[in-house]
Amino acid sequence: MTHTTTIAAKRGGLALAKKAAAAGAVALAVASLQPVSAAHAADARVIGGKPAAQNEFPFMVHLSMGCGGALYKKDIVLTAAHCMDGSGNNTRITVTAGVADLNSSGAIKVKSTKVKVAPGYDGVGKDWALIKLAKPIDRPTLKIATTAKYNRGTFTIAGWGDVREGAGTGTTKLQKANVPFVSDRACKWHYGNRLVPKQELCAGYASGGIDTCQGDSGGPMFRKDDAGKWIQVGIVSWGDGCARSGVPGVYTEVSTFAKDIAKAASAL
């Protein structure tokens, strides 16, 4: 990715991002990891993070096409729309849960049965999707934010994506890191009209160095609520590069779509 022709990449792979048509609008960027589609998803991990302990984030899941996700219900995974190939019956996805190390003998593997992509998703905003599982996974679920109350502060990101931009190798050990909220105004300074403020959140350090990357797409961005419990505020969506100085990662704003997600889940 060059500075003269900036290409936004979904955090699930090195494929062109949903907003690549606006290439060149930004000079530098720090990207999150997401693939444009399941067919092009690439494994990746959190940059600048450290290994997560077993059971530290028991709601985290890994998807076989190279994306992440979180247990919304014990039999439903919340992930990114750009990781999917559309809605409908789908038995091709293998969901791995219950472990921080994907090579662990204790890994729980369950197949998908259906996928529901956000209604009206066209690659710009609305980057969420649900995966119905063949059977429930007996692990804790991750509550999602239903208001914007928790959309500021410091967030936790986690994933099995690249630890270096362009690595394309991912990691078998879950990585974690913390990133601060970035205002819409500051984020638009970098992304311009490619950002959809009402539907997306930005997070990252001005100095770069810590970010999601290819292979982290679909994973949750979360923080503690007033009761000290984890709550999901974002979904790893897209960005320009990974952990570059001066450009934050972009995440789906979960609270905006909470009612739509609940409605879609009840119909799966």
Swiss-Prot record:
Proregion residues excised on maturation: 42-45
GO molecular function: serine-type endopeptidase activity
Record EC number: 3.4.21.-
Active site: H82, D127, S217
PROSITE patterns (alphabetical): TRYPSIN_DOM (PS50240), TRYPSIN_HIS (PS00134), TRYPSIN_SER (PS00135)
Keyword annotations of the record: Disulfide bond, Hydrolase, Protease, Serine protease, Signal, Zymogen
Signal peptide start-end: 1-41
Domain of life, source organism: Bacteria
Cysteine-cysteine disulfides: C67-C83, C187-C202, C213-C242
Record-linked InterPro entries: Peptidase_S1_PA, Peptidase_S1_PA_chymotrypsin, Peptidase_S1A, Trypsin_dom, TRYPSIN_HIS, TRYPSIN_SER
Annotated GO biological process: proteolysis
Known function: Protease that shows preferential cleavage after Arg and Lys residues.
Family label: Belongs to the peptidase S1 family.
UniProt protein name: Trypsin-like protease
Organism: Streptomyces glaucescens
Lineage: Bacteria, Bacillati, Actinomycetota, Actinomycetes, Kitasatosporales
